[in-house]
Amino acid sequence: MTIYLPELEQEHDASFPDIESALHDPDGLLAMGGDLTPKRLLLAYSHGIFPWYSNDDPILWWSPSIRGVFIPENYTPSKSLKKFFKKSGYSITINHATSDVISLCASTRPAEETWIMPEMIEAYQNLAKLGHCHSVEVWFNNELVGGLYGLQIGQVFCGESMFSIKTNASKIALWKFCEHFVAFGGKLIDCQMMNPHLESLGAIPMERPIFNERLQVFSAISVFENCYQPQSLSNG
């Protein structure tokens, strides 16, 4: 089957097609090409668009009809996770090792399963240097054993990926970030594509028009000052 996709130009024009023009099959595929400059990435995320592609593909841009999201104020960890954390010896930080978290999200996956290409790693590390990309780290005996990273768009956190080297590390990173994010005025965590794993963690599906309506409202309001300052959250 032949499909038509708008092809984005590099550098000169960072605009995107209307998200309602995204394909139904594959669901949410909107455009191809362009680049991963900070300007384009920030524009994309502010309109509910994100890059997702494999090694042999051009850059592909998506806005799925059903979005996976966490409502952080409604997030409730399981009793078993709470019990585990108390005895875990884990410590949780924000923005202590963003570059390492991004790299580990790529390297801890089998090569054929990761979409985090070297150019993606570089792009998000550049966004971190500019203050737009942030991470949550889980440490055990001073070793980085889990975490997550994503982009800040006002009161929305656009989660990109997470990793876990030791038991429950990524689940605890998510839990502790939800608590922190709510305390600083955060409203929504975007998980992009809904899948069974995210659903098992508490993500819910949200239709594209509703997601983008909330994105436009929440992205216009900043979280409280110091939300993303490097800091410690809690210790197990």
UniProtKB/Swiss-Prot annotation:
EC number: 2.3.2.6
Catalytic activity: N-terminal L-lysyl-[protein] + L-leucyl-tRNA(Leu) = N-terminal L-leucyl-L-lysyl-[protein] + tRNA(Leu) + H(+); N-terminal L-arginyl-[protein] + L-leucyl-tRNA(Leu) = N-terminal L-leucyl-L-arginyl-[protein] + tRNA(Leu) + H(+); L-phenylalanyl-tRNA(Phe) + an N-terminal L-alpha-aminoacyl-[protein] = an N-terminal L-phenylalanyl-L-alpha-aminoacyl-[protein] + tRNA(Phe)
GO cellular component: cytoplasm
Principal subcellular localization: cytoplasm
Keywords: Acyltransferase, Cytoplasm, Transferase
Annotated Pfam families: Leu_Phe_trans (PF03588)
The UniProt record lists the keyword Cytoplasm: yes
InterPro entries: Acyl_CoA_acyltransferase, Leu/Phe-tRNA_Trfase, Leu/Phe-tRNA_Trfase_C, Leu/Phe-tRNA_Trfase_N
Subcellular compartments: Cytoplasm
Biological processes per GO annotation: protein catabolic process
Record-level Gene Ontology MF annotations: leucyl-tRNA--protein transferase activity
NCBIfam families: aat (TIGR00667)
PANTHER family to which the protein is assigned, alphabetical: LEUCYL/PHENYLALANYL-TRNA--PROTEIN TRANSFERASE (PTHR30098), LEUCYL_PHENYLALANYL-TRNA--PROTEIN TRANSFERASE (PTHR30098:SF2)
The family this protein is said to belong to: Belongs to the L/F-transferase family.
Function according to Swiss-Prot or TrEMBL: Functions in the N-end rule pathway of protein degradation where it conjugates Leu, Phe and, less efficiently, Met from aminoacyl-tRNAs to the N-termini of proteins containing an N-terminal arginine or lysine.
Protein name per Swiss-Prot or TrEMBL: Leucyl/phenylalanyl-tRNA--protein transferase
Species, as recorded: Aliivibrio salmonicida (strain LFI1238)
Gene assigned in the entry: aat
